[in-house]
Structures are given as structure tokens and as C-alpha cells.
């Protein structure tokens, strides 16, 4: 989330004076999990992922250059939008938080497939905060339920819970073995 801004600050801090193009995607193109060092299991590929450059005036140039390789990228107006649209920052901590005891007991469960309506409703409440931040900045963000359909066009279901359970890219993703997985 807003990694391009952090990267630019680092380049500036260390005095980089070369010409460069800097951009970020809202999330990974792939739904994937690491198998071991150097090996990743790609479970699904998103249909659409927001993308923006810093400065935003470079977005079209970069998109035109990489479009043959990443046709899923969709232009966002700026990196604040790509940063605030990082739904993983809502999904991952919420699902882990509401399943912390299960994870700590090392009980195996499917991260999305075992979603419950109540946990999905809590996720939507957390997401309301993200939407309010976007609105304060004049950015109309997608809510989590609509985002799944945006990213994975063929996902079935009306509710967040149904879409999480029915998204083929999420079907075989197991929960982490520790609540400290992404420190």
C-alpha cells in the first residue's frame, strides 16, 4: 500500500539522480502461495488490477509499455487510489484476527472457503473505515464485495461471504500456520 511513495522517498534519500519510472499495482496479479524458497503455487490470475505511476502523469506511458505482459492492469488516477484499494490489507488481517484461536491451535482450515457470514459482516464493517478514508480524499473506492467481482470477473454470489467461498482463485488457499506469518 503506497509502496511507490516509500520507494521514491528511499531513492531521494540516497540521492538517486537517474531517470526512472516508478509505479505500483493495487495488489499482486496472482492469487498465490509460496511452496518453498523459489517455488510459488499460482492458484488464480486476477482479471483486473488497478495501476498507477508516481507521478500519475507517467501512468499511460508505463501501462502502454507493459500492457502486452500484464493486460489485467487498469489505470487508476493516482497511487493513493491503488494504495487504498489494496483489499488484502482488509481481508488478511480480519480473517486471521477472527480465526486467531483456530490458527494458534494449528487446526487446518481454508482461508476463504470456510468463511462465515458473521466474519464477512465484520470485514464489511472494517471496510467501511477504508471507504470513509477514501471519501475524505475524494476517492470513490470499491467496497470489498464489489472488488472481488472487479478482480475476478467470473466469481459467483451476491454477498461477500458467497463471493469469497465461490471464487475459484481462493478455493484452495489454506489459512496460515501462525498469526505472525506476515510480520
Pin down the residues of each PLM region:
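Short, surface-exposed acidic
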Residues: 19, 72-78, 138-146
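Generic secondary-structure signature for well-ordered alpha-helical cores
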Residues: 12, 16, 67-72, 128, ...
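Generic recognition of cysteine residues
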Residues: 2, 16, 32, 72, ...
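A hydrophobic C-terminal alpha-helical subdomain
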Residues: 99-111, 161-183
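Substrate/ligand-engaging "lid" and interaction regions
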Residues: 28-126
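Rossmann-like NAD(P)(H) cofactor-binding subdomain of soluble oxidoreductases
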Residues: 1-36
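Small-residue-rich helix-loop
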Residues: 119, 125-169
Amino acid at each position: 500500500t503506497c509502496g511507490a511513495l516509500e520507494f521514491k522517498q528511499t531513492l531521494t534519500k540516497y540521492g538517486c539522480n537517474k531517470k526512472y519510472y516508478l509505479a505500483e499495482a493495487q495488489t499482486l496479479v496472482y492469487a498465490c502461495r509460496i511452496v518453498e524458497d523459489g517455488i510459488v503455487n499460482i492458484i488464480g490470475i486476477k482479471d483486473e488490477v488497478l495501476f498507477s505511476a508516481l507521478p500519475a502523469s507517467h501512468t499511460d506511458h508505463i501501462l502502454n509499455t507493459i500492457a502486452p505482459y500484464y493486460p489485467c492492469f487498469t489505470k487508476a488516477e493516482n497511487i493513493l487510489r491503488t494504495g487504498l484499494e489494496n483489499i488484502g490489507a482488509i481481508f488478511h488481517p480480519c480473517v486471521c484476527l477472527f480465526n486467531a484461536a483456530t490458527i494458534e491451535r494449528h487446526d487446518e482450515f481454508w482461508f476463504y472457503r470456510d468463511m462465515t457470514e458473521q466474519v464477512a459482516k465484520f470485514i464489511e464493517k472494517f471496510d467501511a473505515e477504508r471507504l470513509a478514508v477514501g471519501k475524505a480524499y475524494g476517492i470513490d473506492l470499491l467496497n470489498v464485495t464489489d472488488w472481488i467481482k472487479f478482480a475476478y470477473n467470473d466469481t459467483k454470489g451476491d454477498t461477500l461471504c458467497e463471493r469469497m467461498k465461490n471464487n475459484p482463485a481462493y478455493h484452495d488457499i489454506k489459512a496460515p500456520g501462525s498469526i505472525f506469518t506476515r510480520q
